[in-house]
Amino acid sequence: MKISIVTVTYNASTTLEATMLSVFNQTYSCVEYIIIDGGSTDDTINIIGKYADKLSYWVSEPDKGIYDAMNKALKIVTGDFLIFMGADDLFYNNDVIQNVVSQISDIDAVYYGSVLFKGIGTKHLGKFNKIKWATTNISHQAIFYPRIIYTTHSYNTQYKIYADYAYNLNLLKDKVNFVYVDEIITLYNMTGMSANTLDETFQKDYRSLLFKSVGVSAYYIGKCIRCLYFLKESLKKKYL
């Protein structure tokens, strides 16, 4: 079984090499590694070139954002399953791919695990149900998409930050099977783009996407949970 790993980069010279090494150090050998760079102007290209002989493919050219670059990758990868690894994220250990592959029994299902926040040590997010889907997304650095999915679905580039969330919600709407594996997949850097940025277009469509994917009840329960969370955080900042 071949696993495709894709890293999308832009001016990531301070973090990319560590990410690449975490891929190369995987004990599972049937891997293709692809880097899609958006025309970096720092030392990123030199770092990619340093390891070019270990890459299945790489390119550096202007793009229209991270999801445009990810869509480019969807047309190139050839693996049975695909995972996107951020240019500032790391596989949790050298056996991650091997551990996940050993648990794959349905080649048409989406497999996902958890991530661990760098510097905090908090595990995120465990197994999902409809209500959890209504409150948050699975980190795309923890998802393995099968060929039947990544060859037939692309990212909506109108969503600048949360196209991966919309992607997953649309898969749920289409009754795609998501299978949880009890593994930490990635050390996730919370300073990345989606960790600190809003997506106004996505927010406008959020309710509709959830109604169609998880249902009205789960949406409103999730909304209550989010409101309570933000109230708790606000009170902590005010009184602690």
Regions found by a protein language model. Give the residues of each.
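Acidic helix N-cap motif at the loop->helix transition within catalytic regions
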Residues: 14-17, 42-50
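Short, acidic, metal-binding catalytic loop of nucleotide-sugar glycosyltransferases
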Residues: 21-30
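Short beta-strand/loop segment that forms part of the nucleotide-sugar
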Residues: 30-39, 59-60
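A conserved acidic beta->alpha catalytic loop
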Residues: 37-46, 86
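Glycine-rich, basic loop-to-helix element that forms the pyrophosphate-binding segment
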Residues: 60-77
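Short aromatic/hydrophobic "clamp" motif used to bind/position activated sugar donors
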Residues: 82
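Conserved donor NDP-sugar-binding/catalytic core segment of glycosyltransferases
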Residues: 90, 94-124
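Conserved nucleotide-sugar donor-binding catalytic segment
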Residues: 120-205
